[in-house]
Regions:
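Substrate-binding groove of N-acetylhexosamine-processing glycoside hydrolases
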Residues: 39-42, 48, 118-121, 125, ...
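Bacterial N-terminal signal peptides
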Residues: 6-16
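An acidic- and aromatic-residue-enriched active-site/binding cleft used to recognize and process polar
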Residues: 179, 206-208, 248-250, 310-312, ...
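Acidic, contiguous N-terminal accessory segments
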Residues: 19-164, 353-363, 373, 477-482, ...
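Flexible loop/turn segments at secondary-structure boundaries
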Residues: 181-183, 193, 208-212, 250-254, ...
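Positively charged n-region of N-terminal signal peptides that target proteins for export
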Residues: 1-4
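Feature activates predominantly on carbohydrate-active enzymes
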Residues: 79, 118-332, 339, 343, ...
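N-terminal/edge-of-domain interface segments
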Residues: 474-679
Length: 679
C-alpha cells in the first residue's frame, strides 16, 4: 500500500492541473571535464612536484627539423585549442621546448636535471617554473614525450613534472579496419592510438576494393576503396604509426569467394560458404593471392605484411581434395606459407602470421622447423592464461614473437607481462566483423576501452591496471573542452517514487538493503563530468512484479526554463535486449511543440547491474557516458550512465520532460537531471 500511495502522490504532483516547476539550483560547473590525474600510459619513472607552469606568455620552441617534431607541434597546438580554446604560438617569455639529445644545450639540460632519455623511443620531460622541456633520445622519443606533456595540461597551466621514460615493449600494435565506414572511425582511432603511444597499426584489409577484385567481380561493396586504404596508411605514418596490412590467407578467405566467384579455388569443393583455398591450384596464387599482395604492397608500402594463417581447419575440410590428402596438412601449410613468404621477401617485405595452426600440439614438434625463422609469430590468447610458456616456447624455436590480446579484464595486462619476459611485442586486437567499424564507439565500445588498458600495459607492464579506462577512452576518441559549462541541477524530490536505499524491501527495486543503490548517496554530487542533485529515483513501470504497479509515464515540469542540452543520469532496473526501445523522453516546449528522445537498451540506457568493465558484459555504447560505478552491500558491481541530449531549440523554454516506459523488463529509471547552458 505504501508503494502504491507514493506513486499516486507523484502522479498527482505532476498532473497538468497541479504541476509546479521542479526546483533548480544554478551551478557554474554543471559539466566539467577534468584533466587526467596521471598520464596514460603510466611513465616508468615519474615525479610530480607541487606547482604549475602558468599559460600566460608560454610559447612553443622546436629545436630541429625532423618530421616527428612537426607532428609533436601539431598535436600540442591541437590540445591547446581543443581543451582551452587557446592558440599555442611560437616564442613567448617562457617556452615549451621540444627537441632531442643531439642538441648540446638540451642534452645538458637533461643531465643537469638528473633525468635521462635512452633508447630509440626514450624521452626526458621536465616542467618547472622555468618552462617545459621534452627531450627525446631521437625525434621519435620527443614525439612520444609530447603525448605525455599533453596530459599535463590544465586550465591553470602545465603541471610540474620530472619524467624519464621509455617503453618496456618495442612493438606496440593496435588493430584497425578498412570498410565503408573507415574515414569517420579511423580519423579518430589513429590520433587516439598515437596519443596512447602505440607505434604500429595492424590494418584488416581483406575487403579493400582491390583492382583485381573489381575486375574479377568479387569486390565487396562494404570494403574501403584503395584510395581510402592509401589515405589511412599515410595518416597513420603522420602520427608515427607504421602500417601493417593484414590479408587473411589460407583460412578466413571468404573475401576471395564473394559473389560466388573463384569457386574453383575452394579447398573443399562441397563447401557452400568457402573458408579456405586450394593450395595445389596455381591459379589460387596467380589469379588472386599474389595480385592482392602486390596491390597491398603498392598501397601501404609496408615493412611487414600479416598473412593470417589462423584457424585454418576450423570449418571446412582441410585437406579436402584427394591430391591434398595425399600430401597431408603439414606439407600444404608449410608450402603455402613459404610461397607467400618468398613472394613478400622478393619485394623486401617481411612476414607476420598467427601462431595457432603452425604451433598447435599436433604439429609443433615438426612443422615450425620447416618455416623461415624470420617470420614474426603472433600468439593470440584471449582468456585467462598468462601466456608465459607458449611465448617462450615460440621464441625458443627461433621466431620473433608477439602476444596478441583482446578485451577481457586483465587479458592485455597479463599477456603484456609475458611478452616482456619473452622479449616480444604485443598486438591489441579487435574483432567485430569485417564491416563493423562504428561499433568501436557504439555497439562494442568495450573493445575500444581495451585499447586504453592495453596501451598502459604494453608501455609499462608493471603499472597497475587502469580503473578509469572507459572515461579515458571516451575522452580520447571524442576530446572535449576543460572549460566549465554552467547550468542548473534539478531536484527530483517532488516526483521521486523510490528511494535509493532499500531498508525493508520497499525501496529501489525491492530486493532489500544488500541489493540497492545506497552507495550512490544523496545531495549535489559530481558524477563523471556532470553535477546532479540526487534525491531519489523516478522509476517507471516494468514487467517485474516489484515495478509492475509503477506509472508508465512521469512528467517533470520545468516551467519554461531554457537549456542548450539536458543531462540525464539514468539506468534500467533489469537488463534488456540490445537496441530494443525500452522507453523515451518526451520534451515539450512552451510553444507547444514536442521532441522525443528514444531510449534503446544498450545504446542510450543500460541496467544498473551492467556497468562497462564487468567480466562477460558486452555490446556497450559510448552514446551515453559512463558516469559512476560502485558496489552493493553484497559486493555486486553496479553503475550509471549519463545521456547528454542536445536541445535542437535552445532558445525556446522547456515546459516539461516526460519519462515514458514501454513496460518491458528493462524499465527506465531517472536519478538525476541537469540543464546545461541556457537559463
Amino acid at each position: 500500500m505504501t508503494r502504491t500511495l507514493s506513486w499516486l502522490l507523484a502522479a498527482l504532483l505532476v498532473s497538468p492541473a497541479l504541476a509546479a516547476p521542479l526546483p533548480v539550483t544554478p551551478t557554474p560547473q554543471a559539466k566539467l571535464l577534468a584533466p587526467p590525474a596521471q598520464p596514460v600510459p603510466q611513465p616508468r619513472q615519474a615525479q610530480y612536484p607541487a606547482g604549475t607552469l602558468p599559460l600566460a606568455g608560454l610559447g612553443l620552441k622546436l629545436v630541429g627539423n625532423a618530421p616527428e617534431l612537426g607532428w609533436a607541434a601539431r598535436d600540442l597546438r591541437a590540445e591547446w585549442q581543443t581543451r582551452l580554446g587557446l592558440k599555442l604560438t611560437d616564442g613567448g617569455s617562457k617556452s615549451v621546448t621540444i627537441g632531442t639529445l643531439s642538441d648540446a644545450a638540451l642534452a645538458a639540460k637533461v643531465k643537469a636535471a638528473n633525468l635521462k632519455a635512452e633508447g630509440p623511443e626514450g624521452y626526458a620531460l621536465l616542467v618547472d617554473a622555468s618552462g617545459a622541456y621534452v627531450v627525446g633520445a631521437t625525434p621519435r622519443g620527443a614525439y612520444l614525450g609530447v603525448q605525455t606533456l599533453r596530459q599535463l595540461l590544465t586550465p591553470q597551466g602545465l603541471r610540474f613534472a620530472r619524467i624519464s621514460d621509455a617503453p618496456a615493449l618495442t612493438e606496440r600494435i593496435g588493430m584497425l579496419y578498412l570498410d565503408q565506414y573507415s574515414k569517420g572511425v579511423n580519423d579518430r582511432m589513429i590520433p587516439l592510438l598515437a596519443a596512447l603511444k602505440y607505434n604500429k597499426v595492424l590494418i584488416m584489409s581483406n575487403y579493400v576494393q582491390w583492382d583485381v577484385a573489381k575486375s574479377g567481380g568479387w569486390a565487396h561493396p562494404g570494403g574501403a576503396s584503395k584510395a581510402e586504404a592509401r589515405r589511412v596508411a599515410d595518416l597513420a605514418r603522420s602520427y608515427g604509426l607504421e602500417p601493417i596490412p593484414l590479408i587473411e590467407t589460407l583460412g578466413h578467405t571468404g573475401w576471395m569467394f564473394y559473389g560466388d566467384k573463384n569457386l574453383d579455388l575452394r579447398q573443399d569443393p562441397d563447401s557452400q560458404n568457402p573458408y579456405a583455398y586450394d593450395t595445389l591450384n596455381p591459379a589460387t596464387y596467380e589469379r588472386v593471392v599474389f595480385p592482392v599482395l602486390k596491390e597491398a604492397i603498392e598501397v601501404f608500402q609496408p615493412k611487414v605484411v600479416h598473412i593470417g594463417h589462423d584457424e585454418v581447419r576450423n570449418r571446412d575440410r582441410f585437406p579436402a581434395r584427394d591430391n591434398g590428402r595425399a600430401l597431408g596438412f603439414e606439407k600444404l601449410f608449410v608450402d603455402d606459407t613459404v610461397k607467400l613468404y618468398s613472394f613478400l621477401k622478393a619485394q623486401n617485405v617481411g612476414t607476420m602470421m598467427w601462431h595457432d595452426a603452425a604451433f598447435s600440439d599436433s604439429v609443433v614438434a615438426t612443422l615450425p622447423a620447416k618455416l623461415p625463422k624470420d617470420i614474426q609469430v603472433a600468439y593470440w590468447s584471449y582468456g585467462t592464461s598468462d601466456g608465459v610458456e607458449p611465448l617462450k616456447k615460440i621464441r625458443a624455436l627461433g621466431f620473433p614473437v608477439l602476444g596478441a590480446s583482446w578485451k577481457d579484464p586483465e587479458n592485455p595486462e597479463r599477456l603484456a607481462k609475458a611478452a616482456a619476459a619473452a622479449g616480444g611485442g604485443m598486438i591489441q586486437t579487435r574483432w567485430h566483423g569485417y564491416f563493423g567499424n562504428p561499433s568501436v564507439w557504439d555497439g562494442q565500445a568495450e573493445q575500444g576501452v581495451a585499447y586504453v588498458r592495453a596501451a598502459n600495459a604494453f608501455w609499462n607492464p608493471q603499472a597497475p591496471t587502469l580503473k578509469n579506462a572507459p572515461a579515458l577512452y571516451r575522452d580520447l576518441y571524442q576530446p572535449g573542452s576543460f572549460l566549465p559549462v554552467a547550468g542548473q541541477t534539478v531536484s527530483l524530490k517532488a516526483v521521486a517514487n523510490r528511494t535509493l536505499a532499500d531498508k525493508g524491501g520497499e525501496g529501489w527495486i525491492g530486493k532489500g538493503p544488500d541489493t540497492d543503490l545506497a552507495a550512490l548517496g544523496q545531495g549535489v554530487k559530481r558524477l563523471g563530468s556532470y553535477t546532479f542533485d540526487l534525491s531519489g529515483a523516478v522509476m517507471t513501470r516494468g514487467e517485474r512484479a516489484a515495478v509492475s504497479e509503477l506509472p508508465e509515464r512521469v512528467t517533470l515540469p520545468l516551467g519554461g526554463r531554457k537549456a542548450a542540452a539536458l543531462a540525464f543520469l539514468h539506468a534500467t532496473g533489469w537488463p534488456g535486449n540490445d537496441r530494443v526501445p525500452v522507453g523515451r523522453y518526451e520534451i515539450k516546449y512552451m510553444d507547444g511543440s514536442r521532441v522525443t528522445q528514444p531510449l534503446e537498451y544498450g545504446r542510450h540506457i543500460r541496467a544498473w547491474t551492467e556497468p562497462l568493465g564487468v567480466p562477460g558484459a558486452s555490446n556497450f555504447s559510448m552514446v551515453a557516458a559512463p558516469a559512476w560505478t560502485g558496489q552493493t552491500r553484497d559486493g555486486m558491481d553496479v553503475g550509471l550512465s549519463v545521456l547528454e541530449w542536445t536541445n535542437p531549440k535552445p532558445g525556446v523554454g522547456i515546459e516539461s520532460v516526460t519519462l515514458v516506459s514501454e513496460g518491458l523488463g528493462a524499465n527506465p529509471i531517472l536519478l538525476g537531471l541537469t540543464l546545461l547552458g541556457g537559463q
